[in-house]
């Protein structure tokens, strides 16, 4: 019986203990992430959708770190690590794509001189904030502290560029 199980595991028909559970979790999280992303693309940003998006991050991170720090890595470990890493990157991609809307909401609420906020790049890692006077350091500091821009590095943004408003 043990030999049959080992052969089934070897050929990929059955996964060893815990792997099937983790794979099922990743598939479910991916489906939920696609639903949330579709809702966000429709422009329906509300607290329920954001809470749902935020709730997806921790389970992905748990599986990602579980397989990242495994000492003896089998082929299945590497596959699940690759899937979880790809899903984790996609999760942050979705979060980076909606981040400018939150910065604009904060700027309007705090009456800051922000004209537009946008993301650039293939992986949306460059944030461009358009303000009225980008040469004024005091205005930049006010915008940075009055919005959620100080969280940008946690979402994987590589740079924040302050530029003059387009006329």
From Swiss-Prot:
This is Uncharacterized protein aq_1187.
